[in-house]
Amino acid sequence: MPVKIPDHLPAAGILESENIFVMSETRAANQDIRPMKVLILNLMPNKIETETQLLRLLGNTPLQVDVDLLRIHDKESKHTSIDHMNTFYRDFEDVRHKNYDGLIITGAPLGQIDFEDVTYWDHIREIIDWSQQHVTSVLFLCWAAHAGLYHLYGLNRKILEQKRSGVFVHRRTCQHFPLLRGFDDEFFAPHSRFAEMDVEEIRQHPQLQLLAESDEAGAYLVLSRNNRNLFVMGHPEYQKSTLNDEYHRDLAQSLNPNVPQNYYRNDDPKADAIARWHSHGSLLVSNWLNYYVYQLTPYDLSDMTAMTPWESQ
């Protein structure tokens, strides 16, 4: 959250140059405060586990967040009871008339399937298109990040020969972005995917900005220049055991998976896993929710044209 300071205080310029969020008394006096309304499109097989992971991160912010859970209405969930889905999830027809401050679209176990061949691809496209007019900011995770870059910006992904699984070191490629406030120069994040985006295509796209990358895992954080879409190529929401669970699941299915890199102590799958990314995941979601949702969204959600442009802040 910002530090409120007197108008024209000399320290303001110094703090802003250090990427510290300060707010003048004049602007603070004109701020309206209400709960943030966030919609989560949960495409992961284990709905309850993913709900818990995302709500854990949203609940670690200073803001009050009201959450709605969204499903693809004609897609049966094989790993979550129909009672749970009917009780807690909404269909798109229930929300298409609404506006939201934020939308999170999760990953999905569809890494080797062409987007156009995904059975519910038309529904995904419809929701993404809807979000550009009805949501202040959209957070795309892993598979959804690739899908969003493909649908909105025409970028194609490359299928990897083997699944990329592990915890990798990343670095910021920019310094003075609100999303990166408080980030270390290098930080860890987990990945679990069968595809990657071309870093140079992202760099050269006029509507996109590459904010963080990894020598081993490639592009990680990509932000649209209108600040509306944030693409996260990894899984900062994962809990400590998730990569281990996926590894043993794939072993049980005789898929001959590689051991997740930099995850187990001494890279020994019989040893304990080491969670190195939780503080990063918490900071990433907190910064997104604060700087790209709360600071930009209109008080009256019925008027999405009243969004505050970044340039005026």
From Swiss-Prot:
The record marks 111 as: Important for acyl-CoA specificity. Pathway: Amino-acid biosynthesis; L-methionine biosynthesis via de novo pathway; O-succinyl-L-homoserine from L-homoserine: step 1/1. The active site is at residues 142, 235, 237. Transmembrane segments: none annotated. The record marks 192 as: Important for substrate specificity. GO terms for biological process: L-methionine biosynthetic process from homoserine via O-succinyl-L-homoserine and cystathionine. Its EC number is 2.3.1.46. Belongs to the MetA family. This is Homoserine O-succinyltransferase. It comes from Shewanella oneidensis (strain ATCC 700550 / JCM 31522 / CIP 106686 / LMG 19005 / NCIMB 14063 / MR-1).
